Regions:
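Extended, low-complexity, intrinsically disordered C-terminal regulatory tails
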Residues: 341-347, 351-355, 362, 366-372, ...
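Basic, Gly/Ser/Thr-rich N-terminal segments that form RNA-phosphate-binding interfaces in CRISPR RAMP
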Residues: 359, 376-377
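N-terminal beta-strand/alpha-helix entry module and adjacent surface
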Residues: 1-174, 178-315, 320-326, 332-338, ...
């Protein structure tokens, strides 16, 4: 028997065994990541969790993943250096946020006297030349909020919202969250906010930021002309907190933050975690500002001696790291999005029914929009979310309506959708 015939027989035997196993339901399957349901080899970082794939199979020395049994002295020093925490400035220089969208986001929490915290996903653009983030839309997913924290819940519409943003030419540029009033001298971000920001940067890139919206005590207008830090955005609800007076000026401020590349790397390794104390730790500023690390880290601080020489001084290793070492501040400005508005009802608000056709009718017939065409009226992110999750649910309709909203032109296609909606709203 020739070698060719032997190979053919072997292949036939393998095929027969595979068919037998297939009928028995015992065929081998490609192992998938539990979070993203994709093979681990498809990407080094899980797009769902933001962690490295196959962490349990990676060898960690210091703060570096090692793939060889032999490591050079320079690699060892670099691995040890990864365990020394150094503060770095933000890579993003400015965050511009649509004023209407961020004000509607915070106004609901302000109505609850800041006793129900919320978070939202930000969609916009990133300018590589100026290192600027533009936030054009704010979407609030399903979530459960409490006085000190919020917990994301599965959102059935999240995939559709992502498609709408992409069809409008937008991408995910970060997250926003609220928190109760706090003393910035004691705490800037708590560990949950730090991990939220880090996860966002790990999943969607370093062009993401965290916006925090909260009441803040500011110098009164009589004693000082400055009511905010440089680059800090003050929203419209300047007296949203109960008890606010002219003497004790309480404003609602919006600040932007970014975590360091080192923080993102440690998060991907799975070593940055919530402290053992859980949510109770959020009620104490000293505990809330500490993020837990599964391996001890040294904080490296630059000091200048009396003669002017700079040197690094490292503190003793610790598993509790102040979030200030991992975060940097970004200036914030408000602007009006030229792409979409954000005035329509939100799809998910606790204690409030979801929008219905009556709400859409009131919105479309509002006298403020009397001079607008149909294409201009539906150029609202939350109108599109409502239409494309409740009425027009196919991908073709999504692309068509988003194209109408983006161009704001009354094409024949736009007129057809207008006629359909008018018929539905008149019944």
């Amino acid at each position: 028997m020739s070698s060719r015939d032997s190979l053919l027989l072997l292949r036939e035997e393998q095929r027969r065994r595979f068919e037998t196993a297939k009928k028995a339901g015992t065929t081998p399957e490609v192992r998938k990541c539990n979070a993203c349901q994709q093979p681990p080899y498809s990407a080094s970082v899980c797009p769902a969790s933001g962690l490295f794939h196959d962490l349990d199979k990676k060898r960690l020395i210091g703060g570096t993943v090692v793939t060889s049994n032999v490591i050079s002295s320079s690699q060892l020093m670099a691995a040890i250096d990864q365990t020394r925490v150094r503060w770095v400035p933000s890579r993003t220089q400015l965050v511009k946020v649509d004023a209407q969208s961020i004000n509607i986001f915070q106004s609901f929490v302000a109505q609850m006297d800041w006793k129900l915290q919320r978070y939202a996903v930000l969609y916009g653009l990133y300018d590589d030349a100026t290192h600027t983030i533009e936030v054009h839309a704010v979407y609030e997913p399903e979530q459960h909020g409490s006085t000190y924290a919020f917990d994301p819940l599965p959102d059935a519409h999240m995939d559709k919202v992502e498609k709408i943003a992409k069809a409008l030419g937008l991408r995910r540029v970060g997250v926003a969250c609220t928190h109760p009033m706090r003393d910035p001298e004691h705490i800037l971000l708590n560990y949950r906010e730090l991990l939220l920001c880090t996860k966002e940067q790990s999943r969607y890139g370093d062009e993401c930021a965290l916006l925090t919206v909260a009441p803040a005590a500011m110098p009164s207008t009589e004693s000082s002309g400055n009511t905010s830090a440089p680059g800090e955005l003050l929203t419209d609800s300047a007296a949203a907190v109960s008890g606010a007076t002219r003497e004790s000026t309480i404003v609602v401020s919006c600040q932007a933050w970014q975590t360091s590349p080192q923080c993102v790397h440690l998060y991907r390794l799975g070593v940055l975690q919530k402290p053992p104390g859980g949510e109770e730790a959020l009620q104490d500023a000293e505990q809330a500002r500490q993020v837990h690390c599964a391996m001890p880290l040294e904080v490296a601080q630059t000091e200048t001696d009396p003669s002017g020489h700079r040197r690094f001084v490292t503190k003793s290793p610790s598993t509790e790291i102040d979030t200030r070492w991992f975060t940097s501040y970004i200036a914030v400005q408000q602007f009006v999005s030229p792409i979409v508005r954000g005035a329509f009802m939100r799809l998910s608000r606790p204690g409030m029914p979801p929008p219905a056709l009556q709400n859409l009718r009131n919105y479309m017939n509002d006298p403020k929009r009397k001079g607008m065409s149909f294409a201009e009226r539906i150029a609202d992110f939350h109108v599109l979310v409502y239409l494309l999750t409740q009425i027009f649910t196919t991908d073709d309709e999504l692309r068509a309506l988003c194209s109408v909203a983006r161009t704001k032109m009354m094409t024949e296609e736009a007129a057809n959708y207008q006629a359909i909606l008018l018929g539905m709203m008149s019944t």
